[in-house]
Amino acid sequence: MKMNNLRVVIITGLSGSGKSTALRALEDIGFYCVDNMPVVLLPQFLEIQSDKSKDISQVAMVMDLREKSFIETYKGIFEQIKARGYKIEIVFLYATDDALLHRFSETRRVHPLSSVSIMEGIRLEREQLRALEEMADKVIDTTSCNVHQLKDIVQRHFLPSSTARRLFIHLISFGYRYGLPADADLVLDVRFLPNPYWVESLKSFNGHHQDVRRYVLSAEASSIFLQKLFDLMEFLIPLYEKEGKPRITIAVGCTGGKHRSVVMANELWSYFSGRDYPVNVNHRDVGKS
């Protein structure tokens, strides 16, 4: 059986145990996340991600009793997925009855088994999910956890020890003609660099091509810019980490998002990955004409 490289994490557990917080923690370290994914759609979803989204290497989703058929179908679906070569990691969250009751009282949320009292719903849900808890690869007791502590536990588990608790860095290359990325924390304009678009032999290639990369980096302005940029990152990133910021998005833009911004975003990726930061890069406009 051929193994699939897509990393699949299923977050499940008792209502009120912190599943949404755990999902956000994984999103902050680069997982593609989906809340309340119907389990019957999981095989199709994973096939689409494997075939069409090569930039996505890890996905996480919350599945629980909000889906009425979950209990009857999850075991067969999980076995089907594993038979196709996917490795599923199940994270099960729980807390004591008193802690869950207190959280429901604080938030005034309705328990999914709302036809009974909250306490009876907690008891029934715990009973129905017992077999799933026994299947789990990681079981987390959130009774004494606040939001920040739970996020830390989840991220420590899924990040290598060298990157745990480090700021996650998301890089985007883009073209100004298509608009700025809405979620950018820092925007770097590299339109001052020599443009391969005006070189006939380079025009049709993008910033991943070695000839384009060499052309852009051969400019004196490029080497000076990168050195000053790396100095800035060395100053800024530890300060963001000290403030507890979990994630930063750095956007690098040129005119069309095909040449200069791609080269510079890749250089930044090499810089951060070489220092063991969790980092990914998305070349938003590289395929546009």
UniProtKB/Swiss-Prot annotation:
The keyword Metal-binding does not apply. Pfam families: PapZ_C, RapZ-like_N. InterPro entries: P-loop_NTPase, RapZ-like, RapZ-like_N, RapZ_C. One of its GO terms (molecular function) is GTP binding. Keywords: ATP-binding, GTP-binding, Nucleotide-binding. The keyword ATP-binding applies. Coiled coil: none annotated. ATP binds at G13, L14, S15, G16, S17, G18, K19, S20. GTP binds at D64, L65, R66, E67. Displays ATPase and GTPase activities. Belongs to the RapZ-like family. This is Nucleotide-binding protein SYNAS_12170.
